[in-house]
A protein has these predicted regions:
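Sec/Tat signal peptide C-region and signal peptidase I cleavage site
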Residues: 18-23
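N-terminal mature ectodomain segment of secretory-pathway/periplasmic proteins
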Residues: 24-103
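Bacterial N-terminal signal peptides that target proteins for export
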Residues: 1-9
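Solvent-exposed helix/loop surface patches that form functional interfaces
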Residues: 33, 86-197
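Short, structured coil/loop segments at alpha-helix boundaries
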Residues: 2, 61-64, 117, 168
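Bacterial N-terminal signal peptides
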Residues: 9-17
Length: 197
């Protein structure tokens, strides 16, 4: 990721924590089976039709050997649409995945680790960051920040949604009375559940 992108990414994340009087903060615990292995903090700041989201997580997993996983995501909305954002995933201190997006003259320039670069005009107003705070009622796609693309969303029961992502990955989101209660993450070597704290 070019140096400019690192600078803007840092700015976005700091912006999400600025103006705490307008901030909404949520906490989730991360579970692997019966063991709590980490936590997630999600923050949203509103300024009219603009908003900034920041989501950070930390977990320690035993998969063959100890794995320390840290993830960070920030997304800025302007006029109700994603405008700029980034994600990063570190495994045992080393960068494993990242993505970055910025708006240039009305076109979103997207970069996905390690070398993918593409542009898009206008992503979905719904994103995984927004799904921490609102139930995506009536939505058939959601913008996924880690891949910088709209991905299919399927409602399978009342308050239950399956988000399908590239690589045959999927997450199950469970809501009650419009509030996110849990996210089930099923990957090749590990199954995790994020539970509302």
């Amino acid at each position: 990721m070019p140096r400019f992108f690192h600078t803007l990414a840092a700015f976005l994340f700091v912006l999400a924590f600025f103006s705490t009087a307008c901030a909404q903060q949520l906490g989730f615990t991360i579970w692997k089976g019966e063991n709590m292995v980490g936590g997630i903090t999600a923050i949203r700041n509103h300024a009219g039709v603009n908003a900034t989201y920041a989501v950070s997580s930390y977990s320690e997993l035993e998969i063959v050997m100890k794995q320390v996983v840290r993830s960070t995501m920030a997304l800025e909305y302007r006029a109700g649409r994603p405008f700029a954002g980034f994600t990063s995933l570190h495994l045992n201190g080393s960068l494993r995945d990242s993505s970055f997006m910025r708006n240039m003259a009305g076109t979103l320039n997207c970069f996905v680790h390690p070398k993918e670069h593409f542009t898009m005009k206008e992503p979905n107003a719904w994103s995984t960051a927004r799904m921490y705070f609102e139930e995506p009622v009536g939505q058939s796609t959601v913008f996924v920040e880690s891949v910088m693309r709209d991905c299919p969303l399927t409602r399978t029961a009342e308050g239950v949604y399956v988000l399908s992502m590239p690589g045959k990955k999927s997450n199950i989101y469970r809501y009650k009375d419009g509030l996110l209660q849990a996210v089930e993450v099923d990957r090749m070597f590990v199954k995790l559940v994020f539970k509302r704290a």
